């Protein structure tokens, strides 16, 4: 992702993504996070499916939180910074994005916060990485 502003500005605000086959595929991949056998999540596939949904449906919170987690897992601290920047830009348009129900938005934000904390604990952060978080 080149920059957060460019990323979000490329897309319109999206609606409910459930009518797209990629949405079902994305949810199936993300469900691995809670599967008892703990199969590996294919983060490259999560990123690919998220981008496909953004192109077809526009940006909405449910897909964006999956995308943010995927680029964090794939790109480390730089991905986390870009993803959270994109999330910040979307949240500034609170009145415009899906889902419209506040409780659904809060649930998605709580979920991504928990998953980002877990991801952050696994990152190997070096001194030279620190400018990415300031």
Question: PLM features: residue spans?
Answer:
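Mid-to-C-terminal functional-domain signal that highlights helix-capping/loop sites
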Residues: 100-134
């Amino acid at each position: 992702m080149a920059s957060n502003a460019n990323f979000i500005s490329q897309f319109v605000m999206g609606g409910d993504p459930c009518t797209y086959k990629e949405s079902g595929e994305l949810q199936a991949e993300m469900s691995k996070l809670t599967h008892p056998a703990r199969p590996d999540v294919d983060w490259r596939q999560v990123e690919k499916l998220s981008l496909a949904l953004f192109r077809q449906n526009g940006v909405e919170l449910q897909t964006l939180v999956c995308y943010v987690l995927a680029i964090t897992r794939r790109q480390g601290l730089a991905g986390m910074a870009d993803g959270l920047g994109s999330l910040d830009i979307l949240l500034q348009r609170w009145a415009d994005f899906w889902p419209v129900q506040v409780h659904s938005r809060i649930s998605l934000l709580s979920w991504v916060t928990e998953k980002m904390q877990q991801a952050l604990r696994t990152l190997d952060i070096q001194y030279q990485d620190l400018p990415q978080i300031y």
